[in-house]
Curated annotation (Swiss-Prot):
Annotated binding of pyridoxal 5'-phosphate, by residue: A75, T76, N156, Q184, S204, A205, H206, T244
Classification of source organism: Bacteria, Pseudomonadati, Pseudomonadota, Gammaproteobacteria, Moraxellales
Enzyme Commission number(s) of this protein: 2.8.1.7
Organism name: Acinetobacter baumannii (strain SDF)
Gene Ontology terms: biological process: [2Fe-2S] cluster assembly
Active site: C329 (cysteine persulfide intermediate)
Domain of life according to the entry: Bacteria
Name recorded for this polypeptide: Cysteine desulfurase IscS
Amino acid sequence: MKRPIYLDYAATTPVDPQVAERMMECLTFDGTFGNAASRSHAYGWQAEEKVEYAREQVANLIKADPREIVWTSGATESDNLALKGVAQFYASKGKHIITSKIEHKAVLDPCRELEEQGFEITYLEPEPQTGLITPEMVKAALRPDTILVSLMMVNNEIGTVTDVAVIGELTRANKTFFHVDAAQAAGKVDIDLSTMKIDLMSFSAHKIYGPKGIGALYVRRSPRVRLKAQIHGGGHERGMRSGTLATHQIVGMGEAFELAGKTMHAEQERIRKLRDKLWNGLQDLEQVFLNGHPTQNVANYLNVSFNFVEGESLMMSLKDAAVSSGSACTSATLEPSYVLRALGLSDELAHSSIRFSFGKYTTEEDIDHVLTITKAAVEKLRELSPLWDMYKEGIDLSTVEWAEH
């Protein structure tokens, strides 16, 4: 079976062969298979050494102290630990939290949970069409009892970049903790936690050619951030996250972060050319709209709405391309993307969107082929659409009164 062209790197990435090789060294009896918490013999010491080296590799990419890296099972757990951990530890200082309507579910769902525990959450509305959350919006929402602001650095559906450096200045001045979900940012944009006033940051390995099931939470040491642990049982990771450390996963994440640091800038440049080529080509079609910010973005994403085409039908027509109509965490539902709805898109436009996301194995030939098949599919589906005919005849569809069924 011929595999389709993979353009869903925002959902997950394949493990880099070099990463897989490093991981294999930590699995079998002749490798580093010991428990990093076993302090009484060489098997444990060797595993601990690998774990600590990986901690340095992750810290180096984001210019942090290795002691500020806490291993988790992924960005979802990191987000949960940051939000619930800070909220529950500092509840006596205030119960107000700020986030936005376009965060990942791994932030929004814990926020709903915290609301049930008596916290008050402000959900910021993004700028229409671009999806920007601006420092001004955050400043207007900050209060003396705001204990936490949680915003993503790069949006996972539209690729818009939030100016977290400036927002960090505002939160620090307000004595408010600032958590940033950087799952889609690491390895794509420069992160310097030695200068940014960010207190907590979530990471995932599988978004940058590392394994699934491993992530990290950066927890600032100075000024110190304290958390209420969410998983108990042994006090690993300085009491913040109990559980035997998965040496092979951790080693894989460290290696992936180191490789990302070496190739990041050249890769962004290469991918931007591919993205621009696809977007420029798609604009030959009528009624095609870019979702997200035209310039303040990372190159790996292109989210496009094709008016008068059902996104699910278009995806089914693109048999040669693996794309999505939203984040992988919500693409199992047929609801329109809540991110695109928050950008002010109509149900119709939100339903007609496709997210193309690019990565290290995407080639120019891939883009040429996907461009050809996408144009053909859109044209074919529009031929079948009575709404398209009405639009072409100059009928303003917003004024049409539809009969009730």
